[in-house]
Amino acid sequence: MLTNASQVLLRNRDLVKDQSVLVLNYEGDHLPKELLNTARSVCGLALDYHHHLMMQPYAAANLTLHFGHQLPNDESFDTVIVYFPKAKALAPYLFNLAAKHLKPQGQLIVVGENKGGIKSLPKQLPSYFDKPFKADNARHCIVFLSELNAAAPTLKLTDWISRYQLDTPQGQVTICNLVGVFSEKKLDEGTKLLLENLPKMRGKVLDFGCGAGVIAAALLKAQPELTLECVDINAMALASCEFTLQANGFNAKIFASDGLAQAAGRYDGIISNPPFHDGLASTTNIATNFVKDSAANLTTGGLFHIVANRHLPYSDTIAEHFGSVDVTAENNKYKIYSNVK
């Protein structure tokens, strides 16, 4: 099923008739494949690994699919479609990337939900694009059109980093935060409680939902002997984590994973401030699977150490898969679950 934004794009598919099309930041549906009924060829770049995996089975000669923060080549396209990001700070990066891959006077299509900030696009679009105009407005979404009128500045990925020092219970670390990756430029409450109650870990440890690498850097600061692996579903987060660990002189294996599906082998420890916070049924289901999969991926005696919003129903699932529930610290917002398999 197509998202609302994709449905509005599809009803405007004649905009890409017989063209080469790049779709940036595509969503969890099959829109890139659907565009092939009109476009000559389609290339998709997903920044969300789950979205990439959903589309991957449909890859073909005229439908190329990539995951990451940029394309592996300098190919140019007649049209670039940008899904306006939920993290608004990511938008300028996507516009610059779109310009890099557009032919001169190439067409830019931007789609987004009204509640997601798309209405402010005319104020946000860089001057190397023409002033955008509204092509469609339906299903609580807007489609804007523009055209590339000048070459965009050539920017490296490092130009999009916010670099700052962060005090943790394990000492000061350097954080390299790319646009679009969650950051408060200070320890968020949940991570602070997690690190204040950091146990001695051993062997091979997995940092699930690593984000910009705050937990990873603090953990290696205190326990550099660990073999650490860091996973996330977001391409910008994975790159941020890599920059953060490099800045602190640490090494870890960093890779994309949809849940724990791509994590290979067993771990002696799993640590996380898991990104499941809203309490919706779908989110609760993902959190439940995370606990179940963590238990399956831990060695005997392995440690499961996470922080979670205290209102989320982790206890029953942890008891089911670990045999007991060990809350080692808590406050009025968060609980630390620290269970041995």
Curated annotation (Swiss-Prot):
CDD domains: AdoMet_MTases. Its main location: cytoplasm. It catalyses: guanosine(1207) in 16S rRNA + S-adenosyl-L-methionine = N(2)-methylguanosine(1207) in 16S rRNA + S-adenosyl-L-homocysteine + H(+). One of its GO terms (molecular function) is nucleic acid binding. The keyword Cytoplasm applies. It is an enzyme of class 2 (transferase). It is found in: Cytoplasm. GO terms for cellular component: cytoplasm. It comes from the Bacteria. Pfam families: MTS, MTS_N. SUPFAM superfamilies: S-adenosyl-L-methionine-dependent methyltransferases. The keyword Methyltransferase applies. Keywords: Cytoplasm, Methyltransferase, rRNA processing, S-adenosyl-L-methionine, Transferase. Its EC number is 2.1.1.172. InterPro entries: DNA_methylase_N6_adenine_CS, Mtase_sm_N, rRNA_ssu_MeTfrase_C, RsmC/RlmG, SAM-dependent_MTases_sf, Small_mtfrase_dom. Monomer. Specifically methylates the guanine in position 1207 of 16S rRNA in the 30S particle. Belongs to the methyltransferase superfamily. RsmC family. This is Ribosomal RNA small subunit methyltransferase C. It comes from Shewanella halifaxensis (strain HAW-EB4). The lineage of its organism: Bacteria, Pseudomonadati, Pseudomonadota, Gammaproteobacteria, Alteromonadales. The gene is rsmC.
